[in-house]
């Protein structure tokens, strides 16, 4: 099911579909491992992304030009790289990545996220979640992290004592007291 005709048109442009009819054959997308959504495509709903079960790389710019307010990647368990670029007033308020345990690179900066659970993402190497509304961020299970960018949120504390591999940390512009 692909309810957004703009998303389906993008899939047609990529050769995964051939007519706008609200769906795409699973056989056409079951082996797709990379999907890069264009910035100015106008996609507002990515329902159907869950059927791209082989995806290891997904890039979605979200904002005025792609006004996506929710995204379900819980079925995309092969993802190792997920880039949700917040541009032009993104309204994305939540994202569940607890099922994406293979994730190594996750960028979700410049959205309206109020919480982010990365406790199941123990393979994370790079986490960029700056410019959100996060009040809490627990990275104690993410011991492989080499880069953590979480500035510009509402964090009052941040414990990186378990993150001994960190080579880059930017937590400026929060309300950190510990």
Feature map (PLM): residue ranges:
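N-terminal capping/linker segments that flank leucine-rich repeat
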Residues: 1-64, 68-77, 81, 99-101, ...
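Canonical leucine-rich repeat
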Residues: 46-49, 58, 71, 92-95, ...
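Consensus "Asn ladder" position of solenoid repeat domains
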Residues: 66, 87-90, 111, 132, ...
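Short hydrophobic transmembrane-like helices used for membrane targeting/insertion
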Residues: 68, 87, 95-97, 125
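Consensus positions within tandem repeat domains that build extended binding/scaffold surfaces
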Residues: 83, 105-107, 126-128, 147-149, ...
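Serine residues within intrinsically disordered or low-complexity segments
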Residues: 109-110, 115, 119, 140, ...
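Low-complexity/repetitive intrinsically disordered segments
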Residues: 160, 167-178
């Amino acid at each position: 099911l692909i309810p957004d005709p703009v998303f389906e048109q993008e899939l047609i442009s990529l050769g995964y579909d051939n007519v706008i009819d609200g769906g795409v054959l699973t056989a056409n997308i079951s082996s797709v491992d990379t999907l890069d959504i264009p910035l100015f495509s106008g996609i507002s709903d990515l329902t159907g992304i869950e059927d791209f079960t082989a995806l290891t790389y997904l890039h979605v710019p979200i904002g005025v030009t792609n006004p996506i307010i929710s995204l379900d990647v819980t079925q995309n368990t092969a993802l190792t790289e997920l880039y949700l670029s917040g541009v032009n007033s993104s309204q994305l308020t939540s994202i569940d990545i607890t099922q994406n345990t293979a994730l190594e690179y996750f960028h979700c900066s410049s959205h309206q996220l109020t919480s982010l659970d990365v406790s199941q993402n123990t393979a994370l190497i790079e986490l960029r979640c700056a410019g959100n509304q996060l009040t809490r961020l627990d990275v104690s299970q993410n011991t492989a992290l080499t880069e953590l960018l979480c500035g510009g949120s509402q964090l009052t504390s941040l414990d990186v004592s378990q993150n001994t591999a960190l080579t880059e940390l930017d937590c400026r512009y929060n309300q950190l007291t510990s």
